[in-house]
């Protein structure tokens, strides 16, 4: 009997291992597959709804793909690294989009993954939109994240605390239920993992070989690290454009002003 149980345990272990390997990133799609493809990568702690207004505005003219980044709500896969997320999206583009797409956009953590994609595959898209993206590593922030979330992670599941966080992020009010639901669904381990990855990301040397036309956007009211990072990205990509958006905070363009973001995409592609 002991031998039988041991054999079953080995088989179950092998099955579970195979299931774990087969888990893939999830994607939300808008528009017809025959149209030019635009991929938009949401910010850390958010999800596909980061770009819901943008997707609704563009879906009649483009095929919009909204990946749910690993470690986030509705994802079945733990967050590992920015580099691994980038690799997985490249593999998806190879398998489903013929190896390249019209445009990729990304906000904050999504912007870092976008820059990593461009570093790993220089010609994967014709256009790129980098919004509110940090590329100046901070070891101090990195080491503060784990103890900070160790003490307050449990509060995230309280609506009053989540509402305070939400208000500080300057996200429009009608997205609160999305935010609260999805923040509660993120594990402590995943939240610490992607926040720490975000705090340490820096540009790869290979980004300079990128052939995409890159457009960089930051809000006028971003913190100094984001503002300096935007200049770093612009300097690494001399043919890129950099625009500071008056009166806007971190990530507000795509989250709160989806129609404006969509219009900028149309203008970029039409040039």
At which residue positions do the language-model features occur?
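Gly/Ala-rich beta-loop-alpha elbow adjacent to hydrolase catalytic centers
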Residues: 106-110, 114
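Short beta-strand/loop motif that positions the catalytic acidic residue
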Residues: 210, 216-218
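Catalytic histidine-centered segment of alpha/beta-hydrolase-like enzymes
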Residues: 248-260
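Flexible "cap/lid" loop of the alpha/beta hydrolase fold
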Residues: 119, 125-155
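Acidic catalytic loop of the alpha/beta-hydrolase fold
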Residues: 221-225, 251
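Active-site loop/oxyanion-hole signature of alpha/beta-hydrolase fold enzymes
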Residues: 65-105
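Conserved HGGG/HGGXW glycine-rich cap/lid loop of the alpha/beta-hydrolase fold
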Residues: 28-74
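Conserved alpha/beta-hydrolase catalytic His-Asp/Glu region
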Residues: 139-141, 155-208
């Amino acid at each position: 009997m002991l031998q039988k149980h041991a054999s079953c345990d080995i088989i179950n272990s092998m099955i579970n291992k195979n299931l774990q390997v087969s888990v893939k990133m999830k994607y939300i799609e808008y528009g017809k597959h025959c149209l030019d493809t635009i991929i938009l990568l949401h910010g850390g702690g958010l999800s596909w709804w980061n770009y819901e207004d943008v997707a609704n505005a563009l879906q009649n003219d483009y095929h919009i793909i909204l990946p749910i980044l690993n470690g986030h709500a509705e994802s079945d896969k733990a967050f590992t690294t920015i580099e691994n997320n980038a690799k997985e999206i490249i593999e998806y583009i190879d398998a489903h989009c013929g190896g390249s797409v019209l445009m990729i956009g990304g906000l904050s953590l999504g912007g870092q993954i976008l820059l990593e994609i461009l570093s790993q595959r220089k010609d994967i898209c014709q256009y790129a939109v980098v919004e509110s993206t940090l590329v100046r590593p901070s070891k101090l922030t990195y080491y503060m994240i784990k103890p900070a979330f160790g003490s307050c992670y449990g509060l995230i599941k309280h609506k009053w605390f989540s509402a305070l966080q939400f208000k500080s992020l300057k996200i429009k009010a009608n997205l609160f239920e999305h935010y609260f639901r999805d923040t509660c669904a993120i594990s402590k381990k995943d939240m610490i993992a992607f926040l720490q990855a975000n705090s340490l990301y820096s540009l790869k040397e290979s980004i300079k070989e990128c052939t995409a036309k890159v457009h960089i956007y930051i809000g006028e009211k971003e913190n100094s690290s984001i503002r300096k990072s935007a200049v770093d990205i612009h300097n690494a990509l001399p043919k890129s454009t950099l625009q500071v958006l008056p009166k806007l905070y971190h990530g507000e363009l795509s989250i709160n002003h989806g129609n404006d973001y969509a219009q900028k995409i149309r203008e970029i592609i039409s040039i």
